């Protein structure tokens, strides 16, 4: 009876002092211990609820363009095991080639268009980077055409319009399409077709005065090339120290589609074309 009484009251008999012969715990001892415990609980102050404290400051909803960007970049970071490599390149000859093209008359050629041409040629040599990963099928899908995304700043945030069939376009056509899409982005007039279907992205963050960055891949693509600002720097040219126009190039790639040797080969080829564009661009 004593044990049942203690068990029903949630009392540990090891904590009770017995008043019976040789310390035997009696019913009265259990009843006294239970009454003492009830009195203690009744006299204990009620816990004071602590109000939840929200972080101070302005709260901006993640929706619209900002929300879409957040979702896509979060997915990229979650799903893609990426890595980034960098190289500095002497862009003096590329800048001179562009100046010569524009001095010859006709529509002006943008630097972004020349960089796009270089990317297209590099992807032809390293097709692993113009691909996507089908996670459900556990397959790498190498894509036959280059649809080139590029970062464009708008009043509502950064968007990535896509130049379709970039590999079939001349530098003049690329310049025109970059201009059209950039203006449409500024006017918030991009269509869903303008923003989808990319296979590789070119991010010219140098327009923001930035030297280098580690781009986040535009899911579900496999790579992104970042281009920093082109600025005068000391450079060893033909064995002599000279001031040259130098740019930092960075490539973030999905390590599932290729190893570092392939990614490094792609980036080195891009840098070589930036430094010696004459042969590559002769058909422009």
Question: Which role fits each region the language model picked out?
Answer:
Residues 5-12, 21-24, 28-29, 37-284:
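C-terminal catalytic/motor cores of large multi-domain enzyme assemblies
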């Amino acid at each position: 009876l004593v044990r049942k009484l203690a068990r029903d009251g949630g009392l540990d008999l090891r904590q009770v002092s017995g008043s019976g012969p040789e310390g035997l715990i009696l019913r009265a001892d259990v009843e006294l211990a239970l009454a003492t415990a009830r009195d203690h609980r009744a006299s204990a102050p009620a816990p004071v609820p602590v109000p939840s404290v929200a972080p101070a400051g302005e709260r901006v909803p993640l929706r619209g363009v900002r929300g879409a960007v957040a979702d896509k970049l979060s997915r990229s970071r979650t799903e893609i095991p990426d890595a980034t490599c960098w190289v500095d390149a002497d862009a003096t000859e590329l800048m001179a080639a562009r100046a010569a093209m524009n001095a010859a008359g006709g529509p002006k050629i943008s630097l972004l268009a020349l960089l796009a041409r270089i990317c297209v040629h590099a992807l032809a040599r390293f097709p692993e980077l113009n691909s996507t990963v089908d996670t459900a099928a556990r397959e790498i899908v190498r894509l036959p055409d280059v649809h080139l995304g590029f970062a464009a700043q708008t009043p509502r945030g950064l968007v990535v319009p896509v130049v379709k069939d970039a590999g079939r376009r001349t530098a003049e056509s690329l310049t025109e399409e970059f201009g059209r899409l950039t203006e449409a982005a500024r006017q918030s007039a991009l269509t869903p077709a303008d923003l989808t279907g990319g296979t590789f992205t070119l991010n010219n963050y140098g327009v923001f005065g930035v030297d280098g960055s580690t781009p986040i891949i535009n899911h579900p693509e496999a790579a992104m090339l970042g281009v920093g600002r082109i600025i005068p720097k000391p450079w060893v040219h033909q064995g002599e120290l000279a001031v040259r126009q130098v740019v930092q190039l960075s490539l973030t790639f999905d390590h599932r589609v290729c190893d570092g040797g392939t990614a490094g080969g792609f980036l080195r080829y891009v840098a070589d074309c930036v430094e010696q564009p004459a042969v590559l661009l002769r058909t422009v």
